């Protein structure tokens, strides 16, 4: 049985988050207002929805890759903690040279719900070696 995340429209014409492809990890978030984000401007945009996240997960808001790539738009990650109810807003910054126009109903960000680790952390004096070791950031190459 899957978790239930409850969503309330704050306005009858607000759009609830939707996954646009089968198996997608993220739900798209829609702007509830028309606005313009000027170059080098940061703005908070309402979505018109409120979400309650179950105790077993957290919701995190991310950029949509296409907007980031095409328009130099960055979304600052807003977190909705376990058991928290929050009006969903998108904290957006325009790194581009042109104004970024947002129309009501545009998909401006995405939210991912992440299952939480419920275990305990234990401090140790040494860590076991792993196959990957301390490698990361590009250590596996591109081919």
Swiss-Prot record:
Q: What class of enzyme is it?
A: hydrolase
Source lineage? Eukaryota, Fungi, Fungi incertae sedis, Microsporidia, Antonospora
Q: Which reaction does it catalyse?
A: dUTP + H2O = dUMP + diphosphate + H(+)
What species is this protein from?
Answer: Antonospora locustae
Against InterPro entries, the record matches this protein to: dUTPase, dUTPase-like, dUTPase-like_sf, dUTPase_trimeric
The keyword Magnesium belongs to this UniProt entry's keyword annotation: yes
Q: Name one Pfam family in it.
A: dUTPase
What the protein does comes down to: Involved in nucleotide metabolism via production of dUMP, the immediate precursor of thymidine nucleotides, and decreases the intracellular concentration of dUTP so that uracil cannot be incorporated into DNA.
Write the protein's name: Deoxyuridine 5'-triphosphate nucleotidohydrolase
> Which positions in this protein are listed as binding dUMP?
65, 78, 132, 138
Q: What is its EC number?
A: 3.6.1.23
Cofactor dependency: Mg(2+)
Q: Please name the GO terms of the biological process aspect recorded for this protein, alphabetically.
A: dUMP biosynthetic process; dUTP catabolic process
Q: Does the keyword Magnesium apply?
A: yes
Keyword line: Hydrolase, Magnesium, Metal-binding, Nucleotide metabolism
| Complex and partners | Homotrimer.
GO MF term (any one):
dUTP diphosphatase activity
């Amino acid at each position: 049985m899957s978790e239930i995340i409850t969503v309330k429209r704050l306005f009858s014409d607000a759009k609830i988050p939707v996954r646009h492809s089968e198996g997608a990890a993220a739900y798209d978030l829609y702007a509830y207002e028309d606005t313009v984000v000027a170059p080098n401007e940061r703005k908070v945009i309402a979505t018109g929805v409120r979400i309650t996240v179950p105790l077993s997960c957290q919701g995190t808001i991310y950029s949509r890759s296409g907007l980031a790539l095409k328009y130099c738009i960055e979304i600052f990650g807003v977190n909705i903690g376990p058991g928290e109810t929050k009006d969903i807003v998108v904290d957006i910054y325009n790194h581009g040279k042109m104004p970024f126009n947002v129309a009501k109903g545009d998909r401006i960000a995405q939210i991912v719900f992440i299952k939480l680790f419920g275990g305990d952390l234990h401090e140790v004096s040494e860590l076991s070696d792993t196959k990957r070791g301390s490698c990361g950031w590009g250590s596996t190459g591109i081919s």
